[in-house]
């Protein structure tokens, strides 16, 4: 169906994909209900879930150096590769109840680094076992919403434990050297 007056082109007999020529947007529908959209906002690309304001992929320039060939490669096995770095907001203004990690050295000592073969890909990997880590530092482990409630590890957040453990070791070494 083509609606010349609005500039919209609807693909599919049921109208499940709508191309908005005026705004350059693509709207995804099912049975008349909007489920998502792909939008252009200035020079940014935004992929939205219409069912939640929190479900959005944003690709754009934040005012820093422009990456002319930004790549996100997602494999069928669920691996994601970026051609740049991934960062997480860590601004103090976003946090409350900030405390230093206590007994980090003893917790790091309990952690077991392992080599393993992924059953789904056959690839050799290095890391931690989520079930073991959950007993030591449960805040580093998340439970998936899949049928198996698969556990995942926030490896970036393990760094806080490692930093505090090194500081504890440094204090022990300094005390020994002072004797």
Predicted regions and their residues:
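Short, electropositive, low-hydrophobicity segments enriched in small/polar residues
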Residues: 64, 131, 164
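Conserved, well-structured core segments
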Residues: 17, 127, 160
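Long amphipathic alpha-helical coiled-coil
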Residues: 159, 163-177
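C-terminal intramolecular chaperone/autoprocessing and neck/assembly modules of extracellular spikes
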Residues: 80-155, 172-179
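Beta-strand-rich receptor-binding modules of extracellular spikes/adhesins
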Residues: 1-87, 93, 148-149, 169-172
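Short alpha-helix boundary/capping segments
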Residues: 61-64, 70-73, 100, 154-161
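Generic signature of intrinsically disordered, low-complexity segments enriched in small/polar residues
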Residues: 38, 61, 85, 119-121, ...
